[in-house]
Amino acid sequence: MLISGSSAALCALALPFAAAKSLWSDSPGNYSSFITTAFPLGNGRLGAMPIGSYDKEIVNLNVDSLWRGGPFESPTYSGGNPNVSKAGALPGIREWIFQNGTGNVSALLGEYPYYGSYQVLANLTIDMGELSDIDGYRRNLDLDSAVYSDHFSTGETYIEREAFCSYPDNVCVYRLSSNSSLPEITFGLENQLTSPAPNVSCHGNSISLYGQTYPVIGMIYNARVTVVVPGSSNTTDLCSSSTVKVPEGEKEVFLVFAADTNYEASNGNSKASFSFKGENPYMKVLQTATNAAKKSYSALKSSHVKDYQGVFNKFTLTLPDPNGSADRPTTELLSSYSQPGDPYVENLLFDYGRYLFISSSRPGSLPPNLQGLWTESYSPAWSGDYHANINLQMNHWAVDQTGLGELTEPLWTYMAETWMPRGAETAELLYGTSEGWVTHDEMNTFGHTAMKDVAQWADYPATNAWMSHHVWDHFDYSQDSAWYRETGYPILKGAAQFWLSQLVKDEYFKDGTLVVNPCNSPEHGPTLTPQTFGCTHYQQLIWELFDHVLQGWTASGDDDTSFKNAITSKFSTLDPGIHIGSWGQIQEWKLDIDVKNDTHRHLSNLYGWYPGYIISSVHGSNKTITDAVETTLYSRGTGVEDSNTGWAKVWRSACWALLNVTDEAYSELSLAIQDNFAENGFDMYSGSPPFQIDANFGLVGAMVQMLIRDSDRSSADASAGKTQDVLLGPAIPAAWGGGSVGGLRLRGGGVVSFSWNDSGVVDSCKADLSARGSDVSQVKFYVAGGRAIDCSS
């Protein structure tokens, strides 16, 4: 990174900089407040949360595929799809809505038996008896290495513990060591379920927990803990009932934890009878644990750290520490955080968001759910499922831009294997089309693609269009044409095919445009009914979906010219979903019926501003439209008024950032941290449990928008070779003065790094554009105020 010498020197003298790379506390977490006090570990598939208790440690354990319900509870499970088609009701629904402006879709609603839920796997217990005279305690989660540690003294004995979850070895590892000798240690696996109760057994130096979520047909799950005592001659018979007991006197003990289920997403199709069932996991888990236990602790840790840092270190953000916060426990910093803010904490949570994504999304895992990977509950809020009218999307907002694009494979596989097969049936049974696929707002891991029973939140077939935005983003940043042809484009094309079949001429305004009918804004009106036509959110999404089909046509390798012609034809008359209403707002519906100061948590009518681009890029220079965006944001409130969610605030922060309104962007960001982030850094839905991870990831996205404006461009601009204008530092607050960023990915390929002065104005930059293809447009960089800046040297 190029930083001008005088600027860097002045910043170093003016403000201290501290690497905000660890969460720490001088006291253990609280078992009764596990989800707000424990520090999380993960390798994509496996999750662990050590509480850090002195002598009776509890580590909460998760495996990402452990769900009850679906075909593991009933052979009649259908993904919510009806037995017979309901599509015959659509013409009448549409006619009524065009005649009256609003209507309902009650004929399309359905029940969702056997939907199921994500659930906790077990607790690992580590009992060292009664310890006294505890002194010098500290626990720490190092974000640089993804290693948890704690240490303390008990009398003359110093005890240190470390834990991590390794992607290369597919296990979590926990180690205890001492300067003299460890007390007797009893290791156990516990699960409180009684119906059906799992079987816990011990053999040699291993504990196995084996269970099923439902009698006979339930999902099989297996967890194994293998204990290793380096240098000891007795490691073959450590069992005591169903626990492993290591005698007093050892200096080092470590264990490996492996787990799996018989869930198999690739069997979620008609060929496999939508069984989602794979092989019994017992032998695989046994082999994984056995292989890992043969390695030394140092070898396991070394491969884990090398793998993790190979991803995490692709991006850096450095903000100042004006308050000397690095010297205070982060649990205190987060508990006492208040506006106007603390750059050290904001930097910490940015790094933490990237850490959490690496820990919950790895090739071969499921994508992060509403709680990422971590739950201590048998029945987490909203089933710990996948909500896709903002939450799943927000989880992936900043992934590609911050160097984590290679970790998105779980999302594409999940969509292709659990949404598309069942979603093709849903398209036919609810919407009368054999073209493409559709799903709705709430999904499990068993292909639940049908509409649930409350229209206000269940009627959301636009999930396929919004998730196609993420398909395009991944291609745009990576420029991986092979991935786009083989994986991304089939998802996007199927969504576009569905919407080609559903667009109808506007018979209310009779303006010749194509609109969606029926629709409603996510979890919002316009009425209690609550369907209407031409919803802004839908129209913007479909406009961008069709635009991406055309923009990526060459890269797709598709020779289906009839499909392309259909897209081109309907794109030309599609209502783009940008209407300015009677009080200067971006209308939420084509009908101008928005209520001023409606502080609903969603910003659905501003999708095209952020994270979309039809407003921000295509019409971003139109002051009438940008004024309407501002009016809408002020009217919508701060996100406190409706449910006080963290995700609503960081969405607002990102929108303000793209308007270059720094004070509002920073205010919303700091408000989210103040109101919603617990002492362990997890985002709490309304400021208290339940935990919902979207704002952890969304905060990263919002901060990226404060750092850079690199909006997507329309297919027309791209084909015309229009220069890609990138604004560095659209909304950097003065509190972050003298900071820097390294490794920001650019659309079309390339990386930019830059630093800024004490006022938040970028004064030095360096770009590496070698990854850009010859057919990608040129990039020009600007700073606040519209001044061009040379990033070439």
Swiss-Prot record:
It is an enzyme of class 3 (hydrolase). SUPFAM superfamilies: Six-hairpin glycosidases (SSF48208). It catalyses: an alpha-L-fucoside + H2O = L-fucose + an alcohol. Its main location: secreted. Residues 1-20 form the signal peptide. GO terms for cellular component: extracellular region. GO terms for molecular function: alpha-L-fucosidase activity. Keywords: Carbohydrate metabolism, Glycoprotein, Glycosidase, Hydrolase, Polysaccharide degradation, Secreted, Signal. Alpha-fucosidase involved in degradation of fucosylated xyloglucans. Hydrolyzes alpha-1,2-linked fucose. This is Probable alpha-fucosidase A. It comes from Aspergillus niger (strain ATCC MYA-4892 / CBS 513.88 / FGSC A1513).
